């Protein structure tokens, strides 16, 4: 087959090029070329978003390959007529927003790449492709008189007054005309049902009053309600922001009336069902209606009232004229009922809008006196009907309740925690401080606007005043005295407000921006560690929003009474643990971990590991538990929603005298310790994260288990308890379970059966430790002998590349290093670790310690090891295998070298320096290189190596003598116990094997018995 790829349009035969490939199931998938075989003429094709095991070799001329982007004739045939238009700069069009709906816009500029810069009716400028722009109907063009950037609300003239009637009516006319033109274009379509009755109108700008949260991707709480409303509106409803003077003079344009007649004929009998659905969402429309009016800041300070009744209950044309009069008469007939409902709905809709990131304003129509002839008797009945509908629908569970976003919830909690708690009587005074104003409609100012809406939506998130600033009404005639009982009257049929919502009001006495700016950074500004930790804890847990102080007190009493003693006992045990064991050979991270556990203060300061403590989910609990900060919730479930919600600043702190009986420490330490107690984790084999009965705590991960589930009683807890996960961590090697059995190596203690009174390992701990030291010394000798074999191999081979590392003998250092014995351990461990792997990488030998270090440590083998140092390694109870091996390496045959130069280490320059020999290096043998011949140099190198081998052999002999003495000590202990002198070990070897095999069988049976009994 040819080595040149074929010419296939749309396919680039390069590695990484994208195309479409047909898999064996005859489905086309986007794919990528991984490899190309020019010999065979095929390619390795990777199907995107599939595993690489599905990669397939396909011939490059196969019909299973096709271009990724191919022209679609079907799509081209379905192009609309409006695609033929060529738009110009400054032309009015319908542009598509991110919610896939079209809104009135104006073309600002036409870019080179075929995109259009458009400015939407609300001032937002975006760059759109041609496909997202539609021509505006001719009868809708040129009707906009005001092009203020905030045209969705009332346009503001230079004098600052609100040209509301002009801007609103113009946009209404534009939208109505666009809807009518769209309806004319669809003459041949089938009759519309109630579900899609207004769909084209929505696309062609039906959302002219859209809440500007579209810039934050259209918050769901408002958009959902508006979509429902728009799909079910028989006509375009009257605007929310109409000037009140224009209400009696409403003239409906001719296109709307003809459209209404068409719709009535098409819809048929679907009106009644639609009417019932409209009644359900009336409450939401009432609250949403005020969400779109906004930016009225410099309004006259007379008493104001939003006229929203036209939009509350959308009705057919016959009822619309009546409601135009209702809207004007509502102020005098039912002021308290309607206005309280609407104002509380306004606060709620403002919160919904601001949760999606909005900071733009809201408009409010000024109240003007109404002519008395507009008030009619049948209008009054409609007003009462409307108010009853609002009463029903504005219950605490609306159809589409606005969901609070998490960010605002956190801000609200930080406000509560940062503010000093106020007494209950001040709360009541705050909520019911002023008398009810029945004769006039009030407007809610600043923070009190939020307070009145709290009973409506208990789960709403509070928004700081800085964000609410642009949309706060400036009618301060009522001051801060706002009736707190009117909103509950309209929302709760019984006329009473649940008290848990009343206590949830934010405790701000002064609603100024200065206070809010302090509150916004409350967690950082206070500088109190406990407040920050509580906020973090509350953020992690999904909490309900009710707050009952009686329950809080009962919870505290129950916590103090029932679950304090087991925690006390375990805390004492934790302190004792860190004193009685030697953890010198643990890892560094483990040392930090143990320091955390040793005292209350250091435990809390080490809580930077707390992000790992998210073990409330069952599926993610089984992780390696090294860095878990677990604490005791004192009888409370971590997932208990109300406990965390009740945790205000004072309720989470236990008083200092409760801990004086346990710790002799300061109050600060007690509070820190109790603060850790909030993070404790229950991780038991039963997978229940609640505390019942007696609890035991793992000494490694500090997680708590039920003693009943673990098969342990209160009087049978072992000295060292390690949980089942730490002993057998999932995802680790099987030998990781012995990580916590270092008691056996350090102290010679092993777990025994609980019913055996005398544990053999406890009685013979010293002998076991001595045996361990003996084995460690034997292991170290084995490593040294292996290193000697390697060196002898280098000595025999004259051309070995590593022979030049012995270019300089270390004999001259005898005079310099008489003092060096003491500091040797400090300096050389890092050196051996940092440069010790070079030889292993070159020669691929087994990674034993001596072969790593026989080339890479210093020429200090000339000074023989003193007997006292060897005895010290024997008698030190805390030393382990690593100590013995490293002590021999350091004293036996240490020298530092590089593959290219012989380097003196830092010890040659000064013994007490602690950094490795990477900075102060002295080049020695380069000076001699020119004077000596190559044959003499090799001979000298071999001589130096031979001397080194002899010294190491002397050290091995010395160490063997010490091992023999260790064996003598163990045998003397055997004689001291009265046992007979053991016979020749070789003769006992078969018997020993049988005994070990029998012991393994017995241990297997014991393990099976223990497994069955624990269940």
Swiss-Prot record:
This is PHD finger protein 20-like protein 1. Keywords: Acetylation, Isopeptide bond, Metal-binding, Nucleus, Phosphoprotein, Repeat, Ubl conjugation, Zinc, Zinc-finger. Residues 186-197, 315-346, 443-453, 480-489, 859-878 have a biased composition (Polar residues). It is found in: Nucleus. GO terms for biological process: negative regulation of proteasomal ubiquitin-dependent protein catabolic process; negative regulation of protein catabolic process; regulation of transcription by RNA polymerase II. GO terms for molecular function: methylation-dependent protein binding; zinc ion binding. The modification Phosphoserine is found at residues 368, 432. It comes from Rattus norvegicus.
């Amino acid at each position: 087959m040819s080595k040149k790829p074929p010419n296939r349009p749309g396919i680039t035969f390069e590695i990484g090029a994208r195309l479409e490939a047909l898999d064996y199931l005859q489905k086309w998938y986007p794919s990528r070329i991984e490899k190309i075989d020019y010999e065979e003429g095929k390619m390795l094709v990777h199907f995107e978003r599939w595993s690489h095991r599905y990669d397939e070799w396909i011939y490059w001329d196969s019909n299973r390959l096709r271009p990724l982007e191919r022209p679609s004739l079907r799509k081209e045939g379905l192009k609309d007529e409006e695609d033929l238009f060529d738009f110009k700069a400054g032309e009015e069009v319908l542009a598509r927003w991110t919610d896939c709906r079209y809104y009135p816009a104006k073309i600002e500029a036409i870019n080179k790449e075929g995109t259009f810069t458009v400015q939407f009716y609300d001032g937002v400028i975006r760059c759109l492709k041609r496909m997202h722009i539609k021509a505006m109907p001719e009868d809708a063009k040129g009707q906009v008189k005001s092009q203020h950037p905030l045209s969705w609300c009332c346009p503001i003239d230079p004098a600052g007054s609100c040209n509301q009637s002009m801007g609103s009516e113009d946009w209404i006319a534009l939208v109505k005309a666009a809807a009518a033109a769209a309806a004319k274009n669809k003459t041949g379509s089938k009759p519309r049902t109630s579900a899609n009755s207004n769909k084209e109108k929505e696309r062609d700008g039906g959302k002219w009053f859209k809440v500007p949260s579209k810039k934050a991707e259209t918050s769901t709480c408002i958009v959902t309600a508006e979509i429902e409303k728009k799909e079910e509106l028989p006509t375009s409803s009257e605007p929310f922001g109409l000037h009140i003077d224009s209400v009696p003079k409403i003239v409906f344009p001719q296109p709307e009336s003809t459209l209404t007649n068409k719709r009535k004929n098409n819809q048929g009998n679907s009106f009644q069902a639609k009417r019932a659905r409209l009644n359900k969402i009336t409450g939401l429309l009432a609250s949403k209606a005020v969400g779109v009016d906004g930016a009225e800041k410099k309004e006259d300070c007379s008493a104001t009232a939003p006229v929203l009744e036209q939009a509350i209950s959308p009705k057919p044309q016959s009822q619309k004229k009546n409601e135009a009069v209702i809207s004007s008469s509502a102020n005098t007939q039912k002021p308290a009922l309607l206005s309280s409902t609407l104002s509380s709905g306004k606060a709620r809709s403002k919160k919904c809008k601001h949760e999606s990131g909005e900071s733009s304003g809201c408009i409010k129509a000024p109240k003007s006196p109404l002519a008395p002839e507009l008030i009619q008797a049948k209008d009054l009945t409609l007003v009462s009907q409307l108010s009853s509908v609002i009463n029903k629908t504005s219950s605490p569970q609306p159809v589409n309740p606005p969901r609070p976003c998490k960010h605002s919830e956190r801000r609200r909690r930080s406000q509560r925690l940062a503010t000093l708690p106020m007494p209950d009587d001040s709360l009541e005074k705050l909520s019911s401080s002023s008398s009810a104003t029945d004769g006039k409609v009030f407007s809610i100012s600043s923070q009190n606007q939020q307070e009145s809406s709290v009973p409506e939506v208990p789960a709403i998130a509070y928004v700081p005043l800085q964000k609410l600033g642009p949309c706060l009404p400036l009618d301060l005639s009522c001051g801060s005295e706002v009736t707190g009982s009117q909103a509950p009257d309209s929302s709760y049929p019984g006329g009473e407000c649940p008290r848990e919502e009343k206590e949830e009001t934010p405790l701000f006495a002064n609603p100024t921006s200065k206070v809010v700016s302090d509150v916004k950074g409350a967690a950082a500004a206070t500088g109190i560690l406990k407040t920050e930790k509580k906020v973090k804890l509350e953020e992690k847990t999904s909490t309900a929003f009710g707050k009952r102080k009686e329950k809080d007190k009962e919870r505290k009493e129950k916590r103090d009474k029932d679950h304090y003693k087991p925690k006390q006992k375990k805390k004492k045990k934790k302190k004792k643990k860190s004193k009685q064991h030697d953890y010198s050979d643990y890892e560094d991270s483990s040392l930090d971990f143990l320091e955390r556990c040793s005292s209350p203060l250091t435990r809390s300061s080490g809580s930077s590991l707390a992000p790992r403590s998210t073990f409330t989910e069952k599926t993610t609990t089984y992780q390696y538990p090294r860095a878990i900060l677990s604490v005791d919730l004192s009888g409370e479930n971590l997932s208990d929603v109300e406990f965390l919600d009740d945790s205000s600043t004072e309720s989470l702190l236990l008083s200092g005298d409760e801990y004086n009986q346990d710790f002799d420490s300061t109050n600060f330490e007690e509070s820190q310790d109790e603060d850790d107690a909030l993070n404790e984790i229950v991780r038991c084999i039963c997978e229940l994260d609640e505390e019942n009965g007696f609890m035991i705590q793992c000494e490694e991960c500090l997680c708590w288990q039920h003693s009943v589930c673990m098969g342990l009683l209160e009087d049978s807890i072992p000295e060292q308890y390690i949980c089942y996960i730490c002993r057998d961590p999932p995802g680790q090697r099987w030998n990781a379970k012995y990580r916590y059995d270092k008691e056996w190596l350090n102290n010679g203690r092993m777990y025994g059966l609980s019913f055996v009174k005398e544990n053999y390992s406890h009685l013979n701990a010293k002998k076991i430790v001595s045996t361990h030291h003996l084995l460690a010394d034997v292991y170290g000798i084995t490593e040294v002998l292996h290193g000697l074999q390697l060196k002898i191999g280098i000595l025999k081979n004259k051309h070995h590349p590593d022979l030049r590392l012995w270019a300089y003998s270390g004999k001259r250092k005898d005079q310099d290093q008489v003092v060096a014995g003491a500091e040797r351990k400090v300096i050389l461990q890092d050196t051996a670790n940092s440069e010790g792997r070079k030889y292993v990488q070159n020669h691929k030998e087994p990674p034993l310690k001596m072969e790593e270090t026989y080339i890479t440590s210093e020429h200090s083998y000339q000074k023989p090891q003193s007997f006292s140092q060897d005895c010290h390694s024997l008698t030190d109870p805390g030393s382990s295998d690593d100590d013995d091996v490293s002590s021999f390496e350091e004293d036996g045959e240490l020298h530092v070298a590089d593959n290219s130069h012989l380097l003196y280490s830092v010890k040659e320059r000064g013994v007490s320096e602690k950094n490795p020999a990477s900075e102060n290096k002295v080049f020695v043998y380069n000076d001699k290189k020119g004077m000596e011949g190559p044959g003499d140099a090799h001979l000298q190198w071999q001589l130096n190596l031979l001397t080194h081998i002899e010294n190491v052999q002397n050290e091995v002999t010395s160490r063997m003598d010490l091992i023999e003495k260790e064996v003598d000590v163990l045998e003397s202990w055997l004689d001291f116990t009265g046992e007979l002198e053991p016979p020749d070990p070789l003769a006992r070897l078969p018997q020993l094997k049988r005994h070990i095999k029998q012991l393994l069988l017995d241990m297997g049976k014991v393990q099976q018995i223990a497994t069955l009994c624990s269940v």
